[in-house]
Each structure stands twice: as structure tokens, then as C-alpha cells.
Amino acid sequence: FINDKELSDKMSLDISEMEKMLNEYLQFTSSTYSEKNETFDISELIENTINKYSNDNISKELIPRVYMNGRKNLIQRALNNIIDNSIKYAKKINLGLSKKKNNIIITIDDDGAGIPENEYQNVFKPFYKLDKSRGDSKSSVGLGLSITSDIIKSHGGNIILEKSPLNGLRVKVFLPL
């Protein structure tokens, strides 16, 4: 029993964050091994994912009927992680889906504060969190983008960060057709 209420609350929050972090990681690793590849329409998956958010600030430009072979639930999880981050830090979000040569390109732009360019690669490291000033009130365990990157790479793809035309962050996901 801890008498200091502030210390007790902080410890409780830290324990909750650790539990969330472990659950996210366990869920990711178990689905990696159990889910089978299937052919699915990624434009439909993105459309359905966006619709679940019921957010009028998300706009989209998707080419229809783009099929890929992969683990659909993992791809959806990666999309959710990116969109969740955008919603946390931005007001306006644009999602795009295009094809170029043998690649599917998913682009997520937002008008949030963005991430300093020198941090672009760091945010994909497990448990890495940007400094507290970026989002002190935002709950994060530092696994979302790490898991997202692992999912994309496990499908033979790549994920990069850039400055968005909306002045926030642009996340570009490349997946093989």
C-alpha cells in the first residue's frame, strides 16, 4: 500500500502502459504465426477501416479493386496503428491508395505537428517514444509504429516517413502486388 496518492497514480498508469505494451506485442506475435495469406481487395479493406472511425476529418482517394496477397488482419492492424496516430496528433487526415509498377502505395497525410526528420527512423524502434512535449497527454507505449513496420516488412514491403503537404507527417507504405 502506497500512501502518496500522486506516486500511486503514476505507478498505476505505468503498470497499465506496460500491460498494454505486452498485450500488443503478444497479439502481434501470435497473429504472425497463426494467420494465413489470402488474396483480398486492399482498397475495400482501407475503405472499411476508414468507415469504422466515423471521423469526418478523414478524406480519401482510393483506386478501386486493388488485390494483394497477404495476411489481411495484420495489414488492417498496421493501417489502424497509422490512422490512430494521425487522429491522436492531427485534425485533418488524407488517405491515398495508388499503384505504381509492381507496388501498392498507401499514403497517409496529416496536418499535425509532425515528427522531426532526424527522428524518422527512431520511431520504428520498439518502445521508442518522442519527447514528452510532443504529446504529454497522449497515451503511448512506443510499439505501434514498430509493429506496423514489422507487419509491412513481413509482407515484403517498406514504410517511410516524409513531410506532408498538409505540413504534418506523411506515412508512405509500399506493398508488392
Model-predicted segments: where are they?
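Conserved micro-motifs of the catalytic ATP-binding
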Residues: 31-35, 67-70
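Conserved catalytic submotifs in the C-terminal HATPase_c
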Residues: 59-70, 100-101
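Short beta-strand/loop element within the Bergerat-fold HATPase_c
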Residues: 92-102
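Acidic ATP/Mg2+-coordinating residue in the GHKL
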Residues: 110
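Short conserved segment of the HATPase_c
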Residues: 115-128
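Short alpha-helical Gxxx[C/S/T] motif in the catalytic ATP-binding
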Residues: 144, 148
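Conserved glycine-rich
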Residues: 156-157
